[in-house]
């Protein structure tokens, strides 16, 4: 059966990959004051961070059910008989719910929706591997969901944020945490656990935090790393610590998407790791 794949824009699948495989991206939306943009479509990450640094206030929304339904209908019209869709964690976004609602409004095509319970480019890596393995005949359709969750258990991301204003505004920090962080320059190590944000540690200063992140990751014996960043200076700091800790390890770099940047703000950097070969 002819099979297509769909995912939302926060998973940051490589654009070139989409040109070579039947994968459609549904963009989430970012609002800056009164202007609405499509994530990585009508606004780039660089433009987004420039705007919020100028004082514009960001907010996000999941794609509309109608927009997702249109993607499904277009794939059906192209002759696809099955769709496998991957979404950002349902515990931090309503995207999974929107994908599910849209699937209930179309007939004549089988749709499987997978809640990845993770975020950002590390999920995109798992999605790319699954699609490649399926397309090459190395992964059966009925095993896709199990394989996805297997891969997702072998990866994660650890992020730190210098400016807590956005996390606090989004209700993800208490007032006490917010005040202490700003006063003492205590930065959190934030990761994803069971689909939600989890603080695995707190340290004073960016260099100390990045060192601790790399030490945690080194225990996982990763095959490759992904540095996610918002500014070039934070990227450089992360690269220096990675080189010192890991030496010559395959490392991808990618700027954090506008939707995720809405919550993390303009001063964030993270390191993701994969325990499997891409």
What function would you assign to each model-found segment?
Residues 36-85, 90-98, 104-105:
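Class I S-adenosyl-L-methionine
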Residues 3-4, 10-24, 29-31, 35, ...:
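Mixed-charge interfacial surface used for oligomerization/domain docking
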